[in-house]
Amino acid sequence: KWQIIDGLQRIGTIKEYVVEQKFSLTGMEFLKNLDGLKFDELPRSLQRRIEETNLNAYLVNPSTPKNVKFNIFKRINTGGLVLAPQEIRNALYQGTSTKFLLQMSNTREFIEATDYSIKKDRMLDREFCLRFVCFTQLNLDNYNGIMEDFLNQGMEYLNGATEEKLYQIQDKFKKTMKICKQIFGKFAFRRLNTEERRGPVNKALFETWSIIIYKMNDSDVQKLIDKRKELCEEFTVLCGDYSFQNAIRATDKTSVKTRISKIGKLVEKILDTGDEV
């Protein structure tokens, strides 16, 4: 039994037309004389041409590690509309993970926190949700500096998670998104600047603020919300820091730890001064 990673719709269409004969040709741009014909009704020369056409396929051994499969497919995925990395994951890790990420990406809290700006095409919204899962559920000490490997691990983690665990993740995800929206408004997960120009949602900031807020207790969260003006002012300064800018541009282990550390210290500073203001 083979698992089709790419081309499922095309192969399925061929099967339905040639083998099962479930439909007739309609809306032909060329060869309009074939409109309305099923496969058996085509001229014999065309039937033979279709039946004798070779299909190229890459077969990967089932025992091949998922990360290797991911990299193999990424290398051969060059024709037509090239799949985005999350679309490849969606094909390789079918199951609980794919359904759960779809649910997460459709939550009102996520959509509003990102201000309707994360596109659903190419599954970019699901990749953001997967990043939340990875940074809040996986051990960052084991992060090898390759983000794609880390995200693949997240898919495997979700496929093995219990219903109770999935509920907990989604519940905390919604709360985290809501808090970030309360604090930053339309600037959530974006770099801040003194001109109040709004840039795009930044993946690195999404990951970092997610893990920081996720780990906070309710009391500290409320303090942060109460001190959001001061927090935003301090974060604006941090966004202008050259080393921090470099840290949110890269995905190596040092950069990931640096941005989490810098924002973590910023939050601690705000919480420590909260009672004095």
Question: What is each residue range found by the language model?
Answer:
Residues 17, 135-139, 157-160, 183-186, ...:
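Amphipathic alpha-helical interaction surfaces
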Residues 24, 82, 110, 183-186, ...:
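A general structural signal for well-ordered secondary-structure junctions
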Residues 164-171, 226, 251-254, 258:
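Alpha-helix boundary/N-cap detector
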Residues 146-198, 205:
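Small-residue-rich helix-loop
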Residues 190-242:
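C-terminal hydrophobic structural anchor segments
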Residues 1-156, 225, 233, 239-256, ...:
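Basic- and aromatic-enriched surface patches that contact anionic nucleotides/nucleic acids
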Residues 13, 57, 91, 176, ...:
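Small-side-chain structural scaffolding
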